[in-house]
From Swiss-Prot:
Family: Belongs to the ATPase alpha/beta chains family.
Entry function: Produces ATP from ADP in the presence of a proton gradient across the membrane. The alpha chain is a regulatory subunit.
Top-level division of the source organism's lineage: Bacteria
Keyword Cytoplasm: no
GO cellular component: a single term: plasma membrane
EC code: 7.1.2.2
Keywords: ATP synthesis, ATP-binding, Cell membrane, CF(1), Hydrogen ion transport, Ion transport, Membrane, Nucleotide-binding, Translocase, Transport
Membrane topology: Peripheral membrane protein
Name of this chain's protein: ATP synthase subunit alpha 1
Classification via PANTHER family: ATP SYNTHASE SUBUNIT ALPHA, MITOCHONDRIAL (PTHR48082:SF2)
Alphabetized InterPro entries for the sequence: ATP_synth_asu-like_sf, ATP_synth_asu_C, ATP_synth_asu_C_sf, ATP_synth_F1_a_nt-bd_dom, ATP_synth_F1_asu, ATPase_a/bsu_AS, ATPase_F1/V1/A1_a/bsu_N_sf, ATPase_F1/V1/A1_a/bsu_nucl-bd
Gene3D superfamilies: 2.40.30.20, ATP synthase alpha/beta chain, C-terminal domain, P-loop containing nucleotide triphosphate hydrolases
Coiled coil: none
Organism: Listeria monocytogenes serovar 1/2a (strain ATCC BAA-679 / EGD-e)
Amino acid sequence: MKTIHFDMNKYETHVDLEYLKEHGRVEKISDGVIFCSGLENAALHQAVLIDERHRGVILELNEEFVGIGLIDKTNDILEGMHVGVSGKFIEVDLFEEMAGRIIDTTGKMLYEESEEKPTATSPLFCVTPAIMTIDSVTRPLNTGLAVIDSITPIGRGQRQLILGNRQSGKTQIAVDTIINQHDQNVHCIYVAIGLKAAYIAEVIETLRNHGAMEYSTVVATAASDSLTAQYLTPYAGMALAEALRDQGKDVLIILDDLTKHADAYRAITLLFNRPPGREAYPGDSFYIHSSLLERAVQMNEEHGGGSITAIPMIETLSDDVTAYIPTNVISITDGQLFLKSDLFNRGQKPAVDVGVSVSRIGGDAQHPIIRKLSKNLTLILSQFEELKELLDFGNALDDGSMKMVSDGRLLTELFKQKILSPLSVTELIVILYAFQNGFLTKIPPANIQTFKGLLLEKAHMHKDFESFSAQIEAINELNESHVEMLEEIIRETGRLFS
């Protein structure tokens, strides 16, 4: 067999092979992704420029082409246009002060122009912290919601999933949690992934009206933005969180929501002709979420002592938690809050289903007094749900069972909470102490909310309550003076209520 020797010198036009290593040509365009030739030195997640002006990122590499996702939605890209790699991996710009900013996936300000230059950058994709740099979760992150802080507490450095149907109150829990951090020295990052622009604006306005934008950053892509921008958004939020964590800060990141993130990634991979798997999602769907969420940790003191607490959200269909994406994220996180539409429609807000919700490591971070006052609340609510079904069928119950029903009904009413009205640790202690010591047994369930409002009002009027609140972090158990104060507050409220 004769060997064919290819001699380029016999041709008048020479091909610059070195040029092709860093440059390429648009060969095909398809719904926000482009197929490109050349770019032999291209690497996954490298930033590129198409025609020197359109931003993109390399998302697919194979023998035939380089797949690029367009960050900016545009119809101006044509076949044959020049593509050049920047030599950098996709990054988010960081500024001296990040609080109050509303940015896109690369750190560019949204809704307003800014001449300020970035002081640093942070890579969107990086490895998770080494296990020897991570510490245990021992400090609480209080949401201000009684049912969560008492039964399914969250610690700083934890990953706690919120899942439920549409319109079941997922975002409201996140917003309440952000607002509750106003005096907790926590930087909050709200990441909106593929939501309606009007909805994002509403959340931002709520945060601004409650002063929460003073310690918060919003990373947002709307449903009208490109698929690639939606896919990159949570990584941009996490990159910003890591930069703040490395400064020794505590960070709370809300990911709203990862269902839309998975849908955007599915669409991108199908456009690149990757083989679909379960529910048409690609085979690495688990990886894209695990590699994201495992970056949320509590660092040890030798590595700054900062933390990232992640609260991702997942939208379910008909309360089905066995679908592909929900089961994936449940297995990645340290616990989940399951919101039921049935509870929400009955006026139980937050609509947390205590029987399915769990916090695997948050209990270690819970305040000792709240942990003691909350130890049997899950059992009370579980027994109430079981016995309530018997009552619905008209079955007679013994006195012991009726006591369980009465306690469960009281506790259910006690856990109802108006939106944008978070409770402090000491306010929660007052409420739980009143319940656990039988002070609410004579209060009709219909009047519990009124009684709770009067109780908290009376607590703030008590001469010792302010000093009790100031010292609560250092108090591990209630002493005689604390008990005397609490019972005095409850008795005074009882006299007012009667």
